[in-house]
């Protein structure tokens, strides 16, 4: 299909079919991404041991922080490209592509280099003990050395979705997971590289996928393609990218702060095994969170295009449909957590103590899952239409304004259970706030129209 025709369909095709067309590939891609992280942890937990799982959990803040910088560029660029395509401003969209590549190179190299210089002190601050530090260090040395490739890979995937190529983005992710699993088998099972093997598998698979992505954008027949003159940073484009990307940046940066605090509270009230239990519970929860993130990625170009084209009824239909779908997804996750937590934990470890702690963590952490999907879609909606302040507030409220104080207070009264209970409590408050803000916004929006 002609690229311009595919883009125009964002404003004409039935919303349900359009959301399925864009969201399903993104959901598959994001679920695949979460699965290959889980597979890494399964290999590490079953082959290396429970302390390696705890060491890997210590590295979560690094992943959140890297994702924060990646989202600031990738999400900001993809949203801006979608709006420009809706406005038929193809030249600006192409320049954003080039600026995205330059920004990812700068951010990826700077982040990886700085973190490598201060790796051990940072890991100690993140909650690493003498037992878990060697595992966390071995993993992050490799991940940070290849960080620039990760930034480029995720950034280009975001641009592919914005450029009406959701299936290509899905293929890139599925290719990455397949290669990652294959390399896990070689590096961990056959060559016995341990936790470093998992890190090498991750980076190498992303490098190979990035090469394929870049090849796609060298095709001059594409609506967006690489050419001279688009890589030089332009202040107005960078401002647009960062102003929209600041919301997901803050959300991921806050997640980094929260995970650091969680890890330290877990070590204080439950020891290294509690950190491992959180790593397992978080892995299960992230499967369903990534489902909704994939749904949001599919919604983003549709909502962004129709907002830019002033087709507001279509924009709202896709938002409502996304909320209903997100609730159904998270309800499925809740059912799994309530009725099959043992089987979830057993995938990662055979250690009875770690399994017991993981079951409790899974039960409590995922308690409010049926509600939290709506909050995620609402936050993404405000980001899609450029309501940066509202999106930032909703991003901050769930993690920083609600969860952080609860983590500081509840464990002093309820010990390790207080750490677990802080998470669903903050989820519930965040949902109430997000729904209230959305209803107020819709009333005002209808009056202005």
Predicted features by range, described:
Residues 20, 36, 40, 73, ...:
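Residue-level signal for transmembrane alpha-helical positions in Major Facilitator Superfamily
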Residues 21-40, 142, 176, 205-209, ...:
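Transmembrane helical elements of multi-pass membrane transporters/channels
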Residues 53-113, 150-169, 277-341, 372-391:
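Small-residue-rich hydrophobic transmembrane alpha-helices
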Residues 1-23, 81-146, 190-245, 303-368, ...:
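Short alpha-helical transmembrane segments in multi-pass integral membrane proteins
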Residues 12, 16-35, 39, 62-69, ...:
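Residue-level signal for short hydrophobic patches within transmembrane helices
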Residues 35-54, 123-130, 186-193, 256-283, ...:
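Helix-terminus/linker motif at the lipid-water interface of multi-pass membrane proteins
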Residues 65-68, 180-184, 210-214, 286-290, ...:
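Hydrophobic transmembrane alpha-helices of multi-pass small-molecule transporters
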Residues 74, 142-161, 169-180, 198-211, ...:
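Short runs within selected transmembrane alpha-helices of multi-pass transporters and secretion channels
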């Amino acid at each position: 299909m002609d690229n311009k025709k595919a883009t125009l369909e964002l404003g004409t095709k039935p919303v349900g079919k359009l959301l399925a067309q864009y969201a399903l590939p993104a959901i598959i891609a994001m679920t695949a991404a979460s699965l290959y992280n889980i597979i890494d942890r399964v290999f590490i937990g079953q082959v290396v041991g429970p302390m390696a799982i705890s060491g890997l959990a210590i590295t979560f803040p690094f992943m959140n922080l890297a994702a924060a910088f990646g989202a600031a560029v990738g999400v900001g660029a993809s949203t801006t490209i979608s709006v420009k395509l809706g406005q038929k401003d193809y030249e600006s969209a192409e320049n954003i592509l080039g600026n995205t590549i330059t920004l990812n190179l700068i951010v990826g190299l700077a982040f990886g280099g700085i973190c490598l210089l201060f790796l051990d002190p940072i890991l100690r601050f993140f909650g690493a003990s003498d037992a878990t530090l060697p595992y966390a260090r071995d993993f992050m040395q490799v991940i940070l050395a290849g960080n620039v490739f990760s930034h480029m890979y995720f950034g280009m995937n975001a641009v592919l979705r914005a450029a009406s190529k959701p299936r290509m983005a899905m293929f890139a992710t599925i290719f990455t997971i397949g290669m990652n699993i294959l390399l896990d088998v070689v590096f961990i099972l056959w060559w016995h590289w341990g936790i470093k093997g998992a890190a090498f598998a991750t980076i190498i698979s992303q490098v190979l996928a990035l090469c394929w992505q870049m090849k796609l954008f060298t095709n001059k027949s594409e609506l967006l393609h690489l050419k001279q003159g688009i890589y030089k940073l332009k202040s107005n484009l960078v401002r647009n990218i960062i102003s929209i990307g600041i919301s997901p940046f803050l959300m991921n940066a806050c997640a980094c702060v929260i995970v650091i605090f969680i890890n330290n509270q877990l070590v204080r009230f439950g020891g290294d095994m509690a950190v491992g239990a959180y790593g397992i519970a978080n892995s299960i929860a992230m499967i369903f969170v990534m489902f909704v993130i994939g749904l949001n990625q599919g919604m983003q170009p549709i909502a962004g295009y129709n907002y830019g084209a002033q087709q507001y009824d279509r924009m709202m239909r896709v938002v409502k449909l996304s909320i209903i779908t997100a609730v159904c997804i998270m309800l499925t996750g809740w059912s799994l957590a309530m009725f099959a937590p043992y089987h979830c934990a057993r995938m990662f470890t055979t250690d009875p103590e770690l399994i017991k702690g993981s079951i409790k963590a899974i039960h409590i952490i995922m308690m409010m899952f049926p509600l939290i999907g709506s909050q995620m879609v609402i936050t993404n909606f405000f980001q899609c239409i450029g309501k940066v302040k509202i999106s930032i507030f909703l991003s901050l409220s769930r993690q920083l304004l609600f969860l952080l104080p609860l983590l500081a207070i509840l464990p002093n009264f309820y010990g390790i259970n207080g750490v677990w209970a802080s998470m669903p409590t903050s989820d519930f408050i965040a949902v109430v706030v997000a729904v209230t803000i959305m209803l107020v916004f819709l009333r005002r929006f209808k009056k202005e129209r």
